[in-house]
């Protein structure tokens, strides 16, 4: 057997002790676990804010909502964002549409009941004129809801989005939030089509869990 010069069979002199830090993540899992822990330590609203900023979505209209309060406060405190309240949700969609035509990207925050005000704005403006409206809906009407009005809109919200061919995602898991929002926002602007993110109480610990 030929042995390359300088290499002695059976010698461990040139070998370094193996460390789990040098192993791929798929084997050691150390870095992957650390990353997962860091992600889970971030509140959902921080993830949404960071993802919007990364995708240059800097204009955010909203109708005040308790679930979205921490996100709204953070947006107002961040000089990179222009956040403002509107009287109704369809007004917010109109402003977003005008902003898009003027070269700005925007999002709207609303509660489930507020979604009931926007089907006409979606059907007559956002969808036919290909406005990539980014919509976040704090979900009410399920998991112990006490308000019948919220429950009725919750039952019809997804069928309305389906009938208008508006992509929508119901997000229940913290570890899926960033990926779903980031990729869907990118797709929304690339295809010029609206997208709705329905944030489950399982994600936000929303109002239905207060009682």
Regions found by a protein language model. Give the residues of each.
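N-terminal amphipathic/basic-hydrophobic helices that include classical n-h-c signal peptides
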Residues: 1-30
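Thiamine diphosphate
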Residues: 19-211
